[in-house]
């Protein structure tokens, strides 16, 4: 079928522009597509510093990163591309700011405002006329806890946010250096201390990102909430997605993720999120810098992380910093007097009525552009600003700042006739001699105009784009960083490889077949898109796979009748004829296990073999090739299978005794990929009754500053099946508690009960006392698809015995062999016969044209090989 891909040539055009600029000595060199970053990010001069609570701002095209550093000085680093960072720069030695917590900076009208909480003892505001300082304290202690953050809304009103024991608070700032009366924002994690707030606005929606609960716990994590009413209106936490960043399991020694900031990257369109992780080396706890992308599906935000492997470099929009002596061939000036000053900015020094400088590379018909300008010192009037949709000297459009009247003015020149089309007031104490920015977002015929990051208007323009540049009328003006990009409204994410493991929204396919349709899906605060596919339709994604492994997928979909799909990695079928049962029109998740993916960059395609299905998203997680069985009878001691232990657990009289609160999780990190299994145990409660099994457990953690098992009792992502005084209960824990099913039954202390949970796909069956019929059965519409197993007590001391956790397997009836190599294991198969490998549970892994080639592909594990004639052999690869 023909392929539909609206963005096929965009990135190639960007690289072409950049190669031309490198030859013409413009500011930004070409960046290779695969020269990216790997978390944690190590910046020059960082090694001796703690990098916590990072915040990034952009000023005149340069990114400035500020952070808590546990030093006597406040520091920042600078970068143009988010890859290459400067040495650490001391931005303040003010004695009041020693050990400043979470310094955050906002630029406004020529002044940089920093808010920080020295030693966590209340907030001070510092100011500077430079992003690199020196910042000086200009207020007394304004208090308001820690982790202060400032947001400026489109009307110019400033808002202040901060941490609190009962959740994030916000208030309207009377001035730039004072705080107002707090409002609770309904953003509290587990009813506990919540910190690290940050607010930004996108397409009329307010997004609040926040962190909890304690910086020194592995389960330090990030949630987000949304509202459409205002910066300090009541926010709605996005419970279905939260937490959006967590790594309590500590894969790659990466845990304790929290407190960061969102910002737009150098392609002018893609969002990024910088945050910190925790590491412990040589007995020292240190925070490190991490960076991941944010993807947008309509109004829905998705964090593409956390990642610990090399990611694609940020795409850099064609741009100019004027850091050279001559203007160069990429600029055309048709009036005025233009020159570069101090290799820093472009100056227009005449009083010409219509002085223009045109940036030769053309914008797309759909584009984002950024411009930086100021009125020259000593000037008080005139108009200056951005030139766009430039076709020739008689056909163009302008977005101008009127210095004398503090207005934004939009002009159109058509066939030599120039017309003022709209005027908008600029907010606040507008100072024309300070650096200001104009941002244009043009999508088809819709144009959004921002001044200093604030939306001034959304208007309708023609479909055609054109060149961009700078213009002044009857005044001298200076111009700085300019950039243009073919991306707008989140489209830039389609030209990078999406990280796997991770989440793939169906609508973020790079390519799609003809006939595959996008449909709007209503959210409580906006819309996103889903993909409707019928027979032979397909979607294809560019992905970046962490390593060659088996992976599990949770495919979220709906279908009125059964359908079948296949998955391809590159050109190879990795799953064929996968059944998607009918869902009756409701959303459900179909687990697809044991998908073998190569490491690095490849494509993933999903094809509909038959049926009619609507796809929402795909969650891909690490699998395991060799699911193990774990058992412990606690006869003389607790065995070494228990790898995550909270509180003090002891072997007592042939049983394992729990603390009053705590979790004990079996298995190693490789077992997190286990999907379908049973877990069972004898449980005796000795005081109070609230204990049982946990399964498909991910990211278990304690809570609070002192490894508090009470605070951490719900700190896991997984399921619980247990007993209480008067009921059996099945619950879902996602750093909180949701009851899924329960049944009344009386239970008594000092009496043993046998609990067993069998989880297969999205269905959980719970058994009591070896009864043949499950006492509870539940199918989760949004399940955890894999994870470890263990036990848990809650306000109850319990005794556990005869623990067993075993994968669900389908016996092949084939005798196993363990050979010395591929040739040995392949012996007995026709060398010309195609052979397919399956897991012991019957899932197809991959196929090849003969057994020797196939065996060379397989990871360590146990497989069943079958050829086209039905010959079969169980093989062990070690």
Regions of interest found by a model, annotated:
Residues 33-194, 201-206, 210-251, 266-271, ...:
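Beta-rich carbohydrate-recognition and catalytic domains
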Residues 221-296, 451-477, 767-795:
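Aromatic sugar-binding interfaces of carbohydrate-active proteins
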Residues 18-26:
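Bacterial N-terminal signal peptides
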Residues 1-3, 815-878:
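C-terminal outer-membrane/trafficking sorting elements
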Residues 275, 371, 551-555, 602-608, ...:
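Extracellular beta-strand-rich recognition modules
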Residues 563-572:
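Short, surface-exposed beta-strand/strand-loop-strand elements in extracellular ectodomains
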Residues 299-547, 573-592, 598-601, 619-810:
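Extracellular glycan-recognition regions
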Residues 5-19:
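Bacterial N-terminal signal peptides that target proteins for export
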